[in-house]
């Protein structure tokens, strides 16, 4: 009987690996471990943010699905507005969204004006932090929700602290709560391909001396580590018409990004009552890309003169949605974004509100 040829070290390693992979799949199911080239999830799906500039800065066209995103910044900087725009974009794509309002401060009428289909949005106003995170966990595990927003981490009060007396300290209670929640949620979020957004506030570090930022976010360090994307949103300018304030200029910095290069920035206007100004962004980015021509204070698109002054051009594009959609289509094509689907006209939205 012929002797079986001896295996080379490399062949022995390959055979041992194949045996291990077979055992793992038999024990934990197909797909428990795979080669990267066999994975169907190399391209990370995303939900648009409602801002073309921010979609570009994020590198994948929006916030990643199946990951945790943190949006933080000072008060009245546009954190909740940005989160509501993401919900609206998710709903336009046919998704289901949930808003966990731990602050008990959601303005439903404002959300509707931003384009959120409020009758279809799930909302919860929990009494304490454990309840809020348990609701988020159950929604994610269902696999039927596309985006879950928790507003905000600072309002996730541990039950022990809530039941204690006023002024009684619970050292590290919120940090422990968030650390446990992150460990429990991360794997489920990836499997269900749900985008979970935590809105957070900033605090000043006590006794900060020397170098480094004096600011920090609430809830400990767990969220910083587990979040795939962290967005720092700041109001950098107040928009005024003579003496009347009508909005603010905001800068969003991608301070952490595990799915694309980080530290990119986006600038856009947030107008009071209407949210992120799509038209203002189209003007700025259109001029930068050479799609909109700017000569002095005059703006033009091809042979069409749009007007004099940025505010007048923005008003013109709000009225002439066909021209606005043409500019956006060309801009998205220039940036290499997916096919543009125009949002419903204000008339259609008014009819739906009246139903």
Curated annotation (Swiss-Prot):
CDD domains (alphabetical): RecA
Keyword Transmembrane applies: no
Binding site for ATP: 73-80
Keyword line: ATP-binding, Cytoplasm, DNA damage, DNA recombination, DNA repair, DNA-binding, Nucleotide-binding, SOS response
GO terms (BP aspect): DNA recombination; DNA repair; SOS response
Record GO terms (molecular function): ATP binding; ATP hydrolysis activity; ATP-dependent DNA damage sensor activity; damaged DNA binding; single-stranded DNA binding
UniProt subcellular location: Cytoplasm
Keyword Nucleus among record annotations: no
One Gene Ontology term, aspect cellular component: cytosol
Family that this chain belongs to: Belongs to the RecA family.
Function (record text): Can catalyze the hydrolysis of ATP in the presence of single-stranded DNA, the ATP-dependent uptake of single-stranded DNA by duplex DNA, and the ATP-dependent hybridization of homologous single-stranded DNAs. It interacts with LexA causing its activation and leading to its autocatalytic cleavage.
PANTHER family listed in its UniProt record: MITOCHONDRIAL DNA REPAIR PROTEIN RECA HOMOLOG-RELATED, RECA
Designated name of the protein: Protein RecA
Gene: recA
């Amino acid at each position: 009987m012929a002797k079986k040829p001896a295996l080379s070290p490399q062949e022995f390693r390959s055979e041992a690996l194949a045996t291990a992979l077979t055992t793992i799949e038999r024990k934990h199911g197909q797909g428990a471990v795979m080669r990267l080239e066999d994975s169907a999830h190399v391209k990370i799906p995303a939900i648009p943010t409602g801002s073309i500039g921010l979609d570009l800065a994020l590198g994948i066209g929006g916030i990643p699905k199946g990951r945790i995103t943190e949006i933080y910044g000072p008060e009245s900087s546009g954190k909740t507005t940005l989160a509501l725009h993401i919900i609206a974009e998710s709903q336009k794509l046919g998704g289901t969204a949930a808003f966990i309002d731990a602050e008990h401060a959601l303005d439903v009428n404002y959300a509707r004006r931003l384009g959120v289909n409020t009758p279809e949005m799930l909302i919860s106003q929990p009494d304490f932090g454990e309840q809020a995170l348990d609701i988020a966990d159950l929604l994610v595990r269902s696999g039927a929700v596309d985006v879950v927003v928790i507003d905000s981490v600072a309002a996730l009060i541990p039950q022990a602290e809530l039941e204690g007396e006023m002024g009684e300290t619970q050292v590290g209670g919120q940090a422990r709560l968030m650390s446990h929640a992150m460990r429990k949620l991360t794997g489920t979020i990836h499997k269900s391909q749900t985008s979970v957004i935590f809105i957070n506030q900033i605090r000043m570090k006590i006794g900060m001396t020397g170098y480094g930022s004096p600011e920090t976010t609430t809830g400990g360090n767990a969220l910083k580590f587990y979040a795939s994307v962290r967005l720092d949103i700041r109001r950098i300018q107040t928009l005024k018409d003579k003496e009347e304030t009508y909005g603010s200029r905001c800068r969003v910095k991608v301070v952490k990004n595990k799915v694309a290069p980080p530290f990119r920035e986006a600038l856009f206007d947030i107008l009071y009552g209407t949210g992120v100004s799509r038209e203002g962004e189209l003007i700025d980015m259109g001029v930068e890309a050479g799609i909109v021509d700017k000569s002095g204070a005059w703006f033009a698109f091809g042979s069409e003169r749009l007007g004099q002054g940025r505010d007048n051009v923005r008003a013109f594009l709000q009225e002439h949605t066909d021209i606005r959609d043409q500019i956006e289509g060309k801009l998205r094509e220039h940036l290499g974004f997916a096919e543009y689907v125009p949002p419903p006209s204000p008339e259609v939205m008014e009819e739906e509100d009246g139903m």
